[in-house]
Curated annotation (Swiss-Prot):
Entry PTM: The phosphorylation on Thr-177 activates the enzyme. A conserved Tyr, which must also be phosphorylated to activate the enzyme in closely related sequences, is replaced by His-179 in this sequence.
Keywords carried by this UniProt record: ATP-binding, Kinase, Nucleotide-binding, Phosphoprotein, Serine/threonine-protein kinase, Transferase
Catalytic activity: L-seryl-[protein] + ATP = O-phospho-L-seryl-[protein] + ADP + H(+); L-threonyl-[protein] + ATP = O-phospho-L-threonyl-[protein] + ADP + H(+)
Protein name: Putative mitogen-activated protein kinase 14C
Length: 356
């Protein structure tokens, strides 16, 4: 049993096993704080995340359980995986107040990476293909990410990609009513509350990311909810009757039905000078009607990416179905703590292929 050490990091007291050495603070936010650590006696570096207030409220405790369960389930080279999870020694559930996650250390997120250099078309293709591989794997588990954006995609110097941040993820059939994620990458069915959200919302986000990678600018850059709608319609045109009839809120339907008619922009004109196959794939990802939108698996077979496919990818990109029945459970914090504690106790680092 390793000893725990206490280290003051960014005005917070961290407690972690002495097998790790603190290197430097990487950043943080409402989700938690992240530090770079080294496995003692080696040159192996990892990212250690200290969750912020993991058990403050019932929804926080449930979110902590969700994040651990999802990360434990994922085992793919293009998706962040859980390498270790622990909490400082606690004699009882009242003392159990902190949770730490250890994951792969990546050099930068895609937002910073894409702005630090001029990316070639080949590099864009390689990065996009890896995003789609990871997304296909996530979707095969029956999970929708819901918050794909450049800062939730990590990249190493060798263009290796991993999808991050499953804090908002849900099963496909979940009927969500909140607007999650950054507005600029939200699918129109989220903005207009159109029925049940499916895997298609993530594909829309990847289409927005592709547009940003090839042009170096955000495609739908709204300043607020109303301007986001205008940005969307200015490029995509007035939603069709097929799209509008699927909207559950009468107010949203009436708003769109009364909106001045506008034709969809010609993508080949809008993106003139860029790779025509990239534009064609982007159009298929940015289809307003989600039922007609290309899937991650189909996008990987598109001519823009087809030559990157390897025979073994199909098996590697398929995950076991993820059991998320707990999402329907309403429990007090104490019970969620016990479930989290059980997940931590039963985690075995060697259950993952750590040599990706």
């Amino acid at each position: 049993m390793p000893e725990f050490v206490r280290v003051a990091i960014n005005e917070s007291l961290w407690e972690f096993p002495d097998i790790y050495e603190f290197v430097r603070f990487l950043g943080g936010g409402s989700f938690g704080q992240v530090a770079k650590v080294r496995l003692r006696g080696t040159e192996n570096y990892f990212a250690m995340k200290r969750l912020m207030r993991p058990f403050e409220r019932e929804e926080d405790a449930k979110g902590t359980y969700r994040e651990i369960r999802l990360l434990k389930h994922m085992n793919h080279r293009n998706v962040i995986s859980l390498l270790n999870v622990f909490h400082p020694p606690a004699h009882n559930m009242m003392e159990f107040q902190q949770v730490y996650l250890v994951t792969h250390l990546m050099d930068a997120d895609l937002h910073r990476y894409s702005r630090s250099k001029r990316m070639s078309d080949q590099e864009i293709r390689i990065i996009l293909y890896q995003i789609l591989r990871g997304l296909k794997y996530i979707h095969s588990a029956g999970v929708v990410h819901r918050d794909l954006k450049p800062c939730n995609i990590a990249v190493n110097g060798n263009s290796e990609v991993r999808i991050l941040d499953f804090g908002l993820s849900r099963m496909c059939a979940d009927k969500m009513t909140d607007h999650v994620g950054t507005m600029w990458y939200l699918a129109p069915e989220i903005i207009f509350l159109r029925g049940q959200y499916t895997k298609a919302i993530d594909v829309w986000s990847v289409g927005c990311i592709l547009a940003e990678l090839i042009t170096d600018r955000v495609l739908f850059r709204g300043e607020n909810y109303v301007s986001q709608i205008r940005c969307l319609i200015n490029i995509m045109g007035t939603p069709t009757r097929e799209f509008i009839t699927g909207i559950s809120m009468e107010r949203s339907r009436n708003y769109l039905e009364g909106y001045p008619l506008r034709q969809r922009c010609d993508f080949h004109h809008l993106f003139m000078g860029y790779d025509v196959q990239a534009i064609d794939l982007m159009e298929k990802m940015l289809e307003m009607v989600p039922e007609k939108r290309i899937t991650a698996a189909e996008a990987m077979l598109h001519p823009y990416l087809r030559d990157l496919i390897e025979p073994h990818h199909h098996a590697e990109d398929t995950a076991p179905v993820y059991d998320q029945n707990f999402e329907n459970m309403v429990l007090p914090v104490k019970c969620w703590k016990e479930l989290v504690s059980h997940e931590i106790r039963n985690f075995r680092p060697d259950q993952l292929d750590l040599h990706f």
